[in-house]
Amino acid sequence: MPSSPRNRRRRTCVALLSVAACIPARAAVAQERQDSVVELSRSTLRVGDKTIRVLLGRVVTGASVAREASFGSATWNGRRYRGSLDFVTDGDGVAVVNRVDLEEYLRGVLPGEIGSRDPRDRAALQAQAVAARSYAGARMGEHRPAYDVTATVSDQVYGGIAVERPETDAAVRATRGLVLTWGDRIITAPYHSHGGVMTAAPDEVFWRRGNEPWLRPVDDRSPDGGCYCDASLMSVWERRFTTEDLRRLIAQYGRDAGVSLSGDVRNLRVVSRGPSGRVTVLEVETSAGRASMRGNDIRFVLRTDGAILPSTNFALEMSGGVAVVRGMGNGHGVGMSQWGAIGRARAGQDARSILAAYYPGTRLSPLQ
């Protein structure tokens, strides 16, 4: 029998939606200069011990706030959510938090995270359901005061009822209650779009954190010599930055990455790479000196049209005042590659095999 995880006191997920003043059945929400309306259904939701709290948004307001509970669904800013809304005050204002059954929450997560897929990708969808449930379950075990997860890429993208799809709903049902565990602990199961030839160890990317035994570089090459991720349109990419682009980007975003240099950019240099080949340290030389940025911070500095760099798995060439960055993959690279999972599903692997490949040493356990 699979072991049962210990962090199982509650299974209700809370999502932050926004700040609001509450009125029976309707609540007006002020967001910047725009008025929004929260409409609450009058049906009753039985909130059990598998409810997660999802943060959907935040509005700073001086309005008085009341907590709403025991509603079947709610609409905020034109988007419907299952469960109920909590209006929570904290130091940042008032937060609208969606309290929803964990399995219902996943129905609003999978479409935004892995998209609508055809039947041959069924095993990948099931693997995604387990990974997303594990991620949420681990967050729920942290006992945050107001909410468990946000509804954005900071945690997992959650779109509510409008995004639900039959194929992703089926994946949630097929894996109901299953999470990944290490010993008696639910693991935080990160995932990303496309890992390239090899996924990353956490300290290659999230260098401020330590490694975990179930997260290590995984070779994603298939037996035919290709890569399981090859169906992705982001297998390879190229970005170009002039020295003026670099000066502007470093001035705007560099401080958060530990680069506070001013002046003209003279050079970018890869100092080190991790086991997966990703750039772990990138040196910037300007007329004012040198400084380095590390791991995933690099992606948030080297932006084009506001979009961060697809990954840190790249080669760099400086020529004629232009930095040419050629890379592969999309996302941080840690944990399960979603396109790799799709490729493995199309090659005949089931969800259990896919999860074992990307989270080695873990077990599938029932959430109780």
Predicted regions: what is each one?
Residues P2-Q368:
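Conserved, single-site charged/polar hotspot
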